[in-house]
């Protein structure tokens, strides 16, 4: 899982963007190494998942200026192409599909599960 911050430039993502890019590059190299053995490697972009936006988590990031999680969720929804924030079940359902035989031809890629919050 990465946040998709490797896809573009955004303030306050100077550490996350390069780390995501490195992880995504590693996944592609790993896919080329283990693919001949029939192993697939697929990553997921997740960002702004509603169930992870707790007041406690945001306090760790924002300190004393903790915004109301509902306001943050609405801001994410407004910024997303699908006009809704991604949900944990979106990520879980996508991961289950990718792990299944129905996705047998998918490897060495990142699947975007951000409701269009991140695009490349």
Predicted regions and their residues:
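Conserved loop-to-helix N-cap of the C-terminal "lid" that shapes the substrate pocket in Rossmann-like
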Residues: 43, 66-73, 84-92
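A general structural signal marking secondary-structure boundaries and capping sites
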Residues: 7, 65, 80, 84, ...
């Amino acid at each position: 899982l990465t946040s998709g911050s490797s896809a573009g430039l955004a303030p306050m993502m100077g550490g996350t963007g390069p780390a995501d890019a490195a992880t995504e590059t590693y996944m592609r190299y790993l896919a080329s190494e283990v693919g001949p053995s029939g192993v697939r490697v697929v990553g997921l972009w997740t960002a702004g998942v509603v169930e992870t936006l707790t007041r406690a988590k945001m306090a760790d990031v924002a300190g004393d200026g903790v915004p109301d999680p509902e306001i943050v969720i609405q801001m994410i929804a407004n910024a997303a192409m699908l006009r809704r924030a991604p949900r944990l079940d979106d990520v879980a359902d996508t991961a289950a599909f990718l792990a299944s035989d129905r996705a047998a031809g998918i490897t060495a890629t990142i699947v975007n599960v951000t409701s269009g919050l991140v695009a490349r």
